[in-house]
Amino acid sequence: MATVDVINGDSISTLHSDIIQTQILTRLDGPTLASTATTSSYLQTLCTEEKLWQELSIDTWPSINDPRVVQAISSFPSGYRSFFADSYPFTEHTWQSEKHDPPTGLISAVDLYYRGEIIYSKVQEMETEKGKSGWFLSSPFRVDILDPKESVQTRIRYPGGDYEAWVKDMEESMKLNWILIDPIKKRAANISSRKAVSARRNWLTGDLEIRFSTVVTAEAAEVAAVVSCGSAEAWKEVDEEVGGEIHVRDVRLQVEDIEGKCMKGRDSLVILQGLLDGKRSCKDDEERRAKERYEEYVRMKIQWRENKERREKAQDTICMIFGFSMFVLLWSFILLR
């Protein structure tokens, strides 16, 4: 949404409030609207209108125009204004004590874009079980937005030819908002990196997997929202020479440890709670920094894997030396009797 220069608070008070709200304030984006409210008490009253923030929020995230989300936002301290203040900035993880019960009843609001146009929206409630023995808490954490046999038709086409160039274009053209809402604690957070941090082919399925990740360095973990795109025919891979129509095959959320394994439900929910409670940042370069953090995390994963392989190799060598020494000692004992 475009921004406009804000008129001086004294001069703008001469304009009718309806003109200001319908012709001026509706042209502002969220951060500009919030800063405009601080210029005068008159503008503060106009800028805090619930309908204004509701329309701005729905324009930004179409998926939230869902009865379940509307009901959840209605309980926020300042309604849509509080929701926008939580969801628009990037969030930094705050450490959570494992003694605290993990959040329950979380809602996911997902909006997927291609070259600025929305191609998919959905709201899904996260069914979690209470208690330490619940299967959800002890199983690998994964939230699937699409059903196994479901796919989303898009206007995206792979023209054929240079596959790597198409992969790069897809990485740059796709954008994802994944807003996590906690109706109980009345908090929300956009846990996606917005722009993709990586795109690579899954050699098992042949689909292109595009990742929108938030790295939690303190926990050595990655909150990964993954979008899989493939051929319109489910049984067929994209032909790299001929090309063809592309469908969205999978949209999922998972929390991975440094080994790339999906973490258990309880540990994952604790990390997600840390993002919901985390400090917010609206710096202009946050999308670039999110990708840089991911690339640094990938390097850290490679270093960790190499160190693990060296340790295992050293342990194998020690075991071999010990076994050989015992073998020599045994035969020496037998021969010298």
Curated annotation (Swiss-Prot):
InterPro entries assigned to the protein according to its UniProt record, in alphabetical order = AT3G44326-like, F-box-like_dom_sf
Residues of the F-box domain = 10-58
Coiled-coil annotated spans? none
Q: What is this protein called?
A: F-box protein At2g27310
Q: Which organism is it from?
A: Arabidopsis thaliana (Mouse-ear cress)
